[in-house]
């Protein structure tokens, strides 16, 4: 279910403070965050955010196409190791 329009998009306060501070100082250095639930705002474009995936921090460079999405969408939490190629048991009938 989508978030209500009257509530507006969500972003953690500490994350917004970091972005406004970096924008006021004209810095583009990467910074770490655990806030995967925060929505990407237009103020964040051009920054590199290190998003935690439960094990390590994944660098995410924010561009215009990411606005409105969540930070967690760009930092996968699970590793896909592939399917077994030689499994013939399921194919028999």
From Swiss-Prot:
Recorded superkingdom: Bacteria
InterPro entries to which the protein is assigned, alphabetical: Ribosomal_uS19 (IPR002222), Ribosomal_uS19_bac-type (IPR005732), Ribosomal_uS19_CS (IPR020934), Ribosomal_uS19_SF (IPR023575)
Molecular function terms, GO-annotated: rRNA binding; structural constituent of ribosome
Keywords in alphabetical order: Ribonucleoprotein, Ribosomal protein, RNA-binding, rRNA-binding
Matches recorded under SUPFAM superfamilies: Ribosomal protein S19
Lineage: Bacteria, Pseudomonadati, Spirochaetota, Spirochaetia, Leptospirales
GO cellular component: cytoplasm; small ribosomal subunit
Protein name: Small ribosomal subunit protein uS19
Family membership noted in the UniProt record: Belongs to the universal ribosomal protein uS19 family.
Matches recorded under PROSITE patterns: RIBOSOMAL_S19 (PS00323)
A Gene Ontology biological process term: ribosomal small subunit assembly
Pfam families in UniProt: Ribosomal_S19
Origin species: Leptospira interrogans serogroup Icterohaemorrhagiae serovar Lai (strain 56601)
Protein function: Protein S19 forms a complex with S13 that binds strongly to the 16S ribosomal RNA.
């Amino acid at each position: 279910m989508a978030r209500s329009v009257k509530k507006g998009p969500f972003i953690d306060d500490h994350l917004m403070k970091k972005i406004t501070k970096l924008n006021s100082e004209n810095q583009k250095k990467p910074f770490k965050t655990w806030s995967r639930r925060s929505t990407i705002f237009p103020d964040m474009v051009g920054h590199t955010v290190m998003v935690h995936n439960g094990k390590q921090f994944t660098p995410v460079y924010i561009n215009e196409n990411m606005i409105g999405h969540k930070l967690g969408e760009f930092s996968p939490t699970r590793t896909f190791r592939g399917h077994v190629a030689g499994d013939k048991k399921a194919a028999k009938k």
